Amino acid sequence: MALNVVILAAGKGTRMRSDLPKVLHPIAHKSMVQHVIDTAHKVGSDAIQLVYGYGADKLQASLGEQQLNWVLQAEQLGTGHAVAQASPHIADSDTVLILYGDVPLIQQSTLEALLAARPENGVAILTVNLGNPMGYGRIVRTPCEGQEQGKVVGIIEQKDATAEQLLINEINTGIMAVPGKQLKAWLSRLSNNNAQGEYYLTDIIAMAHADGVAIDTAQPQSAIEVEGANNRVQLAQLERAYQAREAEKLMLAGANLRDPSRIDIRGDVTVGMDVMIDINVIFEGKVTLGNNVTIGAGAILIDCEIADNAEIKPYSIIEGAKLGVAASAGPFARLRPGAELKQDAHIGNFVEVKKAVIGVGSKAGHLAYLGDAIIGDGVNIGAGTITCNYDGANKHLTVIEDNVFVGSDTQLVAPVTIGKGATLGAGSTITRDVGENELVITRVKQKHLTGWQRPVKIKK
């Protein structure tokens, strides 16, 4: 029995006031529909049917390389009509899980509970109880022996409900698990004879009851899981809810957040114990923080690994980089892809490192560019040092061996190797290899011109 997931993503989202299809609007730097697709994979989907309509070119540009079966809904005639477009791709033996591309916070655990609640050859509906159910379809039940809440007999939409039914506060989320054979039969019997003139997917529940099919329900841990976004205000509310949930996960895993409401998590963050994260930090991609790591205010960390006791000082950007034990970067440092700081290495303010290894205990405190370089242990890089790695066509390597002292304002024109223990005088331009323990100075001889007068500004 295969799990066949149908994701409804055909809507334009007029209230978003955007040329972008609604489901492509982002939560945590990832489209809403991508969140849903990822969760579908987590619950073990064997196939995913993506029902699309508006903005097909943009949807396919965003999602096209994934294993999806694209199902066109040329006209938006209701949720039942949307699911019916996927019928040719549903086997009789499938369990069909119906999800929505604009409901991005649905959790794996909730869907697993829904699937577990589905009776054999029956239907499971995800419902939630709301204090104010206005606008939602209501779950209609009748008394049944052995069922405290009663037996589900149907779902009635808001516009079609009686005054009595409007008092019901258990609402339909639209998410359900249905047997494939029966689903296809029920879809073929749908009618649009209702206030909206649409084919309601919810009508299949009354059909299931009439056919004697068992119906059960499950509920999410939080109602926010089943909230959709129809405008940018709701989108922002979902973003805040997502960030609050992710911040809570970090704190439960051992991180101290200076202010949990001022952190942005846009990927997968793994933390050790006693991690300290200051305000306005952004995480993107896959980020790993070891024990006792400190992240300063305003830092941005993208796809990086930070070892135990390391420190990222305020307003530093760390992307595709690794920091070893007790290494530090910043404030205002930039580590680009391929940068690696070994144990106790330090990169200070306004230093940029790209595709370079900084050895154990080595440091570049201020105003330097270190690109395409291998720097040994115990090296001091003076302020203003530049590895000149690009000749206009190709990149070249600079090698600085252990215990080298590089004076301020030094240019190292690659390819070049500086031997162990060498000293480079301030202001030097190094174009040839330097031997071990050599002192190299390439400055022009200093001149003293007595009696020299500064230019005087010409009055106009």
From Swiss-Prot:
| Region of interest (Linker), residue spans | 233-253
InterPro entries linked: Bifunctional_GlmU, GlmU-like, GlmU_C_LbH, Hexapep, Hexapep_transf_CS, MobA-like_NTP_Trfase, Nucleotide-diphossugar_trans, Trimer_LpxA-like_sf
User: Where found, per UniProt?
Assistant: Cytoplasm
Q: What biological-process terms (Gene Ontology) are attached?
A: cell morphogenesis; cell wall organization; lipid A biosynthetic process; peptidoglycan biosynthetic process; regulation of cell shape; UDP-N-acetylglucosamine biosynthetic process
Q: Return the broad EC class.
A: transferase
**Residues binding UDP-N-acetyl-alpha-D-glucosamine, per UniProt:** 8-11, 22, 73, 78-79, 100-102, 137, 157, 172, 230, 336, 354, 369, 380
- Which UniProt keyword terms apply here? Acyltransferase, Cell shape, Cell wall biogenesis/degradation, Cytoplasm, Magnesium, Metal-binding, Multifunctional enzyme, Nucleotidyltransferase, Peptidoglycan synthesis, Repeat, Transferase
Q: Which reaction does it catalyse?
A: alpha-D-glucosamine 1-phosphate + acetyl-CoA = N-acetyl-alpha-D-glucosamine 1-phosphate + CoA + H(+); N-acetyl-alpha-D-glucosamine 1-phosphate + UTP + H(+) = UDP-N-acetyl-alpha-D-glucosamine + diphosphate
Kindly list the cofactors needed: Mg(2+)
Magnesium listed as a keyword: yes
Sites binding Mg(2+) sit at D102, N230
Q: A Pfam family for this UniProt protein?
A: NTP_transf_3
Its chief place of residence is: cytoplasm
Write the Enzyme Commission number(s) for this entry.
Answer: 2.7.7.23, 2.3.1.157
Q: Where acetyl-CoA is bound, by residue?
A: A383, N389, Y390, S408, A426, R443
Please provide, alphabetically and separated by semicolons, the GO molecular function terms listed in this UniProt record: glucosamine-1-phosphate N-acetyltransferase activity; magnesium ion binding; UDP-N-acetylglucosamine diphosphorylase activity
Q: Write out the ranges of the annotated region (N-acetyltransferase).
A: 254-460
UniProt family annotation: In the N-terminal section; belongs to the N-acetylglucosamine-1-phosphate uridyltransferase family. In the C-terminal section; belongs to the transferase hexapeptide repeat family.
> What does this chain do?
Catalyzes the last two sequential reactions in the de novo biosynthetic pathway for UDP-N-acetylglucosamine (UDP-GlcNAc). The C-terminal domain catalyzes the transfer of acetyl group from acetyl coenzyme A to glucosamine-1-phosphate (GlcN-1-P) to produce N-acetylglucosamine-1-phosphate (GlcNAc-1-P), which is converted into UDP-GlcNAc by the transfer of uridine 5-monophosphate (from uridine 5-triphosphate), a reaction catalyzed by the N-terminal domain.
- Subunit-level organization: Homotrimer.
Which protein are we looking at? Answer: Bifunctional protein GlmU
What organism does this protein naturally occur in? Shewanella baltica (strain OS155 / ATCC BAA-1091)
